[in-house]
């Protein structure tokens, strides 16, 4: 079994499943349709091109840094200023970091790995306004999808890891249910299952439709990578004096009430 791991991080992400008209919601983790769209863009496929080979890939994601939901109240007017366009609420995930994995044929994954490093079309995290930071591709792993997501070092930002340095961090895993079933986990390690309508039949605007998949929720205890003993910057990066730490841990967050009043998933 071969797995391609992806690092999905950026200032903003938005992974819509239920977005309609003036409300553009986001899920709290990357969707399979969003990742397939990113892969298709990387290899240079048009919206009308077939995606059956990409649909065969099995998908899972680990929430290394969940981020928080923010809302953009979006207004627009015509060029002459005489007519207002419909108002919209657009939701995003801010400061989130995810580890995603796709499992499938090695030859296909090798091509996708290369394409993500040199994409044909620009990559984005759900919406065109959400470019990723690099690297996106973390390369191939010769193991199963569940094991790959469990074993990879924690990708969270240093400020987030510092907030959890005294307590273990259990990251949420969301995987295609068939992956978990094949792993034959004990019953006590199994998680809740829900349906997700994020399997694209096609990206063709003339017949765009989505199917359901079953997603199982697990957890994985993660830890930061061991520092390189030969890295002269290691001591500096581990400096206990972080001038931003108090801001990052600020109890007064003006967005909290907004998020609670406008849940979107």
Residues covered by each model-derived region:
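Internal, well-folded beta-alpha domain core
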Residues: 64-265
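Glycine/small-residue-rich interface belts in oligomeric ring/scaffold proteins
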Residues: 2, 17-81
